A protein has these predicted regions:
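Amphipathic, interface-forming alpha-helical segments with heptad-repeat character
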Residues: 114, 129, 140, 152, ...
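A short, charged
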Residues: 132, 136-145, 381, 387, ...
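Short loop/turn segments at secondary-structure transitions that flank enzyme active sites
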Residues: 112, 153-155, 189-193
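N-terminal topogenic membrane-targeting module
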Residues: 47-142, 340, 344-345
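Membrane-proximal, solvent-exposed terminal domains/tails of membrane-associated proteins
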Residues: 169-170, 174-462
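Structural flexibility/helix-modulation signal
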Residues: 142-184
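Short small-residue beta-strand/loop micro-motif enriched in glycine and branched aliphatics
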Residues: 2-4, 113-117, 363
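N-terminal alpha-helical membrane-insertion module
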Residues: 1-80, 430-462
């Protein structure tokens, strides 16, 4: 358990304590309560240096006051986006006001057919973004901007039957392997800090918008040259939908949503810790600025009132600021996974779980046998896919919460998996001992077969 007490030194608090301590001691020196001056001086030192859950006493007083002021006010909404053309003809970037910052968004496109292997609780994949690279690009091309790297997604879905979801949660355990995850870079421009850069392009807000649009385009291009597929956003719709928590009211330790609760945390363990916590929805934010240490926060949404996971620290009194990116905690540079880990397809010879994403491109999936078919369809349903099977699979569909149709398929919002031949799209082969993709012709795996899954195979037509 984390020690709630800590020490923090700052020049301002040290000067204030050193200035007040001598008068306190002198004031009581000639009285019978001479010890009171020493006690007051000691109390001042404690107030100036000792923290409780990351804040001094003065910080807690300020947090309570700020929370009382804003708790009955609805959160500030972002302005309507405006699309501004860059110097490239036909290339557009949407910008909008978010508080006092003008922002633009860059979507990171996942690399298709990228497996994730979990080794000792750590996710290994080559679909990653180095936060240090983002800081380096900002330092070179736009040192007066800062960037928020925001990932949003979920470990398991909610479209399948509850028994199916519960079983899949047991199978994957605490693997940091979200079934769905999308990542954006939000570039933030402070009008005061960027005044000189903006004035080189135009006067006032027009110059600021042009500078931000050009910077977003340049950062996206440089990321692509480093192997990270990035596209400037023409709207904020997908980002807003992925990060919406249905805000209703801020409480001291959580945010009440329309039908769920969201809590903001500090978690120094990095993405492997962030994505291993059980939650219905997860949002992570890492802020990067040239010459400054990265800062992060994690928001976990659950149907019931949240309990703090191990390795996490609740940001009491700062839930709404954390949601809006105003209350972040210092962290270190790390490698951030970009896309979904996907569906559990097997394990390595060393019993390390292997996950494969199927939610980014359309494919025709060839499944080796009835058990492989059952496992993939059941796990895909638990991972949030909409499963459609033929009329002869009526009992199977009822058990897992699937639909009945003429075409057998597994559909995600941005991709459809056809369980059979389909012209014009890539073909993937999944067997009990191998998975073959356009990127990995023969990736050896071993089957993971929890006994509880066998009852779904028994529901298949004979």
């Amino acid at each position: 358990m984390r020690n709630p007490l800590g020490l923090r030194f700052s020049t301002g608090h040290a000067l204030l304590a050193s200035a007040l301590a001598p008068p306190c001691i002198i004031a009581f020196l000639e009285t019978r309560y001479w010890w009171a001056g020493i006690a007051l001086a000691s109390l001042g030192v404690i107030v100036a240096t000792v923290t409780f859950y990351g804040r001094r006493i003065t910080g807690w007083v300020a947090a309570v006051y700020a929370w009382l002021r804003r708790r009955r006010r609805p959160p500030d909404s972002s302005s309507e986006p405006v699309v501004g053309a860059t110097v490239k003809p036909g290339d557009h970037v949407a910008v909008r006001w978010q508080g006092e910052f003008l922002v633009a968004v860059i979507e990171l496109i996942p690399r298709p057919f990228t497996p994730t292997v979990i080794v000792d609780g750590q996710a290994h994949t080559d679909d990653m973004l180095d936060t240090g690279l983002v800081e380096e690009l900002l330092s070179v091309h736009c040192p007066d901007l800062e960037a928020d790297i925001v990932s949003a997604g979920y470990r398991v879905g909610n479209t399948a039957a509850p028994d199916v979801v519960s079983l899949y949660q047991q199978v994957i355990g605490t693997d940091p392997a979200p079934a769905n995850r999308r990542t954006w870079i939000v570039l933030r421009a402070d009008p005061e800090r960027t005044r000189k850069s903006a004035q080189r392009r135009d006067e006032g807000v027009a110059g600021l918008a042009r500078y931000l649009v050009a910077s977003a385009t340049r950062i996206a291009d440089r990321l692509a040259s480093h192997g990270v597929d990035a596209v400037c956003g023409r709207s904020f719709d997908d980002y807003d939908h992925a990060t919406d928590i249905g805000f209703v009211r801020e409480k001291w330790s959580m945010i009440k949503g329309r039908d769920a609760y969201t809590a903001a945390y500090a978690a120094p363990g990095g993405p492997d810790v962030w994505w291993s916590a059980r939650a219905d929805h997860t949002i992570t934010r890492v802020r990067v600025a040239p010459g400054m240490a990265p800062q992060s926060t994690v928001l976990l949404t659950t149907a019931d009132k949240p309990k703090t996971p191990g390795g996490f620290a609740r940001l009491f009194g700062g839930q709404r600021p954390a949601l809006q990116g105003q209350h972040l905690v210092a962290t270190r540079h790390c490698q951030l996974p970009i896309g979904s880990a996907g569906v559990l397809v097997g394990e390595t010879v060393n019993r390390c779980p292997v996950y494969m994403p199927f939610d980014d491109v359309d494919i025709a999936l060839n499944l080796g046998d009835a058990q492989t078919f059952t496992q993939f369809v059941v796990r895909a349903a638990a991972a949030g896919a909409m499963v459609t099977v033929g009329p002869q699979f009526e009992e199977f569909a009822r058990l897992i919460g699937a639909h009945i149709g003429q075409e057998v398929k597994v559909a995600w919002p941005n991709a459809t998996i056809y369980l059979g031949p389909h012209p014009g799209i890539d073909r993937v082969i999944l067997r009990h001992n191998v998975i073959g993709t356009p990127r990995h012709r023969q990736l050896p795996i071993r089957r993971v077969s929890p006994p509880e899954e066998s009852r779904y195979q028994m529901a298949l037509p004979k």
